[in-house]
């Protein structure tokens, strides 16, 4: 009951600010509500406050006591939705699939798959030594075990 009510309140807040979107909503047995959100242009503290107020002011503590935590998806968190991939086009990702693990630049993303590009050293077709080649792959989201944005300083 509480989860459905919180989901509806969150949807209403996200409709008012459509650059924000819900990543996860969890409610534990002690009625601790944890909302993780992300945004097309990132998430500010004011965005978290707005979402928190939009939910908290529409729930009755007299009816059911609760605690509320609203956070943004952290930089070290794996990407979990196509919309997160789209906002990170052009950035370097660390991608893990069932059989492989590699770093690549995110070239494009849609609702079903992503396109990645990276440079690899491979043996020359003729003679000794190696040559650098540009590789590209299209990966459906179903093949991705985990993908994180690589932070560079």
Curated annotation (Swiss-Prot):
Look up the domain of life of the source: Bacteria
Q: Which InterPro entries match?
A: Ribosome_maturation_RimP, RimP_N, RimP_N_sf
Cellular component terms per the entry's GO annotation: cytoplasm
GO BP terms: namely: ribosomal small subunit biogenesis
Kindly list the places in or outside the cell where this protein is found, as annotated in its UniProt entry: Cytoplasm
Work out whether the entry's keyword set contains Cytoplasm. yes
- Which keywords has UniProt assigned to this entry? Cytoplasm, Ribosome biogenesis
Does the keyword field hold Cytoplasm? Answer: yes
Task performed by this protein:
Required for maturation of 30S ribosomal subunits.
Q: Which family does it belong to?
A: Belongs to the RimP family.
Matching NCBIfam families: PRK02001.1
Q: What is this protein called?
A: Ribosome maturation factor RimP
UniProt organism field: Christiangramia forsetii (strain DSM 17595 / CGMCC 1.15422 / KT0803)
